[in-house]
């Protein structure tokens, strides 16, 4: 439904635009509403030779002046976005133009370059009442089994057998 309404409104706008006597290529109107979507170009805006406001719907669009355009400063052309003689002000494009004027030889686009920071979380002082070890639980278990194995090997070499003390040699 929304798509149909959008197509319907666009068709009415195209028919009414041609009804005002503007020239166009085929059925597509040229001129008139083009300034409403024209972005602000760096520091200067390209304007038709007759300007936007002279005559009916732009003096530069009639009289076969399609190829001619002049450059005027943005401040001289962009007055208010609500007035009929002005294009909407693209603040982002103007600020980018000011940045490019401030650093003309930058080359690469301006990117915020900062090394990555590793954030270490700190949860405050930790209180522990147990004995602190410098090794983990798995290493502690391996150390205990290695100590038991070494003691059993030492017992075998000194005359003890694996079965215990009942077969002792004294």
Swiss-Prot record:
Region Disordered: start-end pairs: 146-170
Gene Ontology biological-process entries:
chorion-containing eggshell formation
Transmembrane regions: none
Please list the residue ranges that the record marks as compositionally biased, kind Polar residues: 160-170
A cellular-component GO term for this protein: extracellular region
State the organism's lineage: Eukaryota, Metazoa, Ecdysozoa, Arthropoda, Hexapoda
Alphabetically ordered keywords of this record: Secreted, Signal
**Classification via InterPro entries:** Chorion_2
What is the role of this chain? Answer: Chorion membrane (egg shell) protein; plays a role in protecting the egg from the environment.
Q: Which residues form a coiled coil?
A: none
Q: Note the Pfam families from the entry.
A: Chorion_2
Extent of the signal sequence:
1-17
Q: What is this protein called?
A: Chorion protein S18
Biased composition annotated in UniProt, kind: Low complexity: 146-159
Q: Identify the domain of life.
A: Eukaryota
Compartments (UniProt record): Secreted
């Amino acid at each position: 439904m929304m798509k149909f309404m959008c197509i319907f409104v666009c068709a009415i706008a195209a028919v009414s635009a041609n009804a005002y006597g503007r020239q166009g290529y085929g059925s597509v109107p040229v001129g008139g509403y083009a300034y409403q979507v024209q972005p602000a170009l760096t520091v200067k805006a390209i304007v038709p030779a007759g300007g936007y406001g002279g005559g009916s719907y732009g003096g530069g669009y009639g009289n076969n002046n399609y190829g001619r355009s002049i450059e005027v400063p943005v401040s001289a052309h962009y007055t208010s976005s609500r007035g009929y003689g002005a294009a909407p002000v693209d603040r982002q494009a103007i600020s980018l133009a000011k940045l490019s004027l401030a650093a003309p030889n930058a080359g690469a686009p301006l990117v915020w370059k900062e090394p990555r920071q590793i954030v270490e979380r700190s949860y405050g002082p930790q209180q522990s009442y147990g004995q602190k070890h410098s090794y983990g639980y798995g290493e502690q278990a391996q150390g205990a089994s290695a100590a038991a194995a070494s003691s059993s090997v030492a017992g075998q070499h000194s005359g003890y057998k694996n079965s215990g003390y009942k077969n002792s040699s004294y």
